[in-house]
A protein has these predicted regions:
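Catalytic core of membrane glycerolipid acyltransferases/transacylases, capturing the structured
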Residues: 46-63, 73-75, 89-150
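Non-catalytic C-terminal accessory region of glycerolipid acyltransferases
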Residues: 2-18, 22, 154-285
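Hydrophobic alpha-helical segments typical of transmembrane helices
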Residues: 68, 106-109, 132, 191-192, ...
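A short beta-turn/loop motif at secondary-structure boundaries
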Residues: 86-90, 221-222
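Generic preference for hydrophobic
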Residues: 82, 97, 121, 229-231
Length: 285
């Protein structure tokens, strides 16, 4: 009888690897300390926007948010590189930005990249409970989405569609509904496309890559890394009905996959396009 023994695995880290791990954790906590201070200061300044009526107040709030985001990314050593495929200005009136989502840094990168017009995010309900950040979200008119309750999520999208039509609001949405952990693009939720069709406004597709290499989901190690943002051409929804939802989802997904490759990312699966019903996430571990 032959007995085979596996060779022991060498788990020893080199000196340079150990130093990089320590520095990655140190960068995270230094950036976190800066974030806390910057959040308190910029939230306080944001309150002045409430005293200014109309678009000027919203622009002030967005200026504060962009300054906050740019400062954090500088502290994290994550420069944002932006590519726009269209030379035309953004669509007039309200419209939707649809972007993939890898990391919390994606949000900051979009604040820096999307300078053309004031916008708000459709954000998960849990963020509205975070001190300072949640208060800013409410004051700035962000769209609250309850991922735990389908009926409330649909209701929030219906209100958002009315706000987009009547006020010309621009909303940024993550159709995956969560962050991917491996850098690929997850299946899309149907709700955001119901919103687009209800509002009858264009979708501007966006791809972001690099943020997942700077700060991965479920980790506290921060690595300085460029974040690339590619902004595509608008996809029109005017005249489409809810029966066209899946086709609109397919066209938008293919557009974002193309932009993602242009950003330098590896291939993402085309299928499945649609996230299974009843599941809050679809993340790949």
């Amino acid at each position: 009888m032959n007995v085979y023994t596996a060779a022991p695995m060498d788990l020893t880290l080199s000196h340079s690897e150990a130093v990089e791990i320590v520095l990655a954790y140190a960068r995270f906590w230094l950036a976190m300390a800066y974030t806390i201070v910057a959040t308190v200061v910029m939230f306080t300044l944001t309150l002045f926007g409430l005293l200014v009526p109309g678009d000027a107040g919203r622009r002030w709030q967005l200026f504060c948010a962009r300054t906050w985001a740019a400062g954090i990314l500088r502290a994290a050593r994550c420069p944002v590189v932006v590519t726009r495929l269209s030379t035309a200005p953004p669509p007039a009136g309200g419209f939707l930005y649809f972007s993939n989502h890898h990391s919390m840094l994606d949000i900051l990168a979009l604040f820096v990249a999307l300078k053309e017009t004031p916008f708000v995010f459709a954000a998960k309900r849990e963020l509205f409970k975070v001190p300072f950040i949640g208060w800013h979200l409410r004051l700035a008119g962000y769209i609250e989405v309850d991922r735990q309750n389908r009926d409330r999520a649909i209701s929030s999208f219906t209100r958002a569609a009315r706000q987009i039509r009547e006020r010309g609001t621009v909303v940024t949405v993550y159709p995956e509904g969560t962050r991917s952990v491996d850098g690929t693009i997850l299946p899309f939720k149907k709700g955001p496309f119901m919103l687009a069709l209800e509002a009858q406004v264009p979708i501007v597709p966006i791809a972001v890559d690099g943020a997942q290499l700077a700060l991965r989901k479920h980790t506290l190690r921060l690595h300085g890394h460029p974040i690339r943002v590619v902004i595509g051409n608008a996809i029109e929804t005017r005249g489409l009905a809810q029966a066209d939802r899946d086709d609109l989802l397919r066209r938008t997904r293919l557009a974002i996959l193309d932009l993602h490759r242009m950003a330098g990312a590896g291939p993402s699966p085309i299928e499945p396009m649609i996230a299974p019903p009843g599941k809050r996430t679809g993340e790949r571990e």
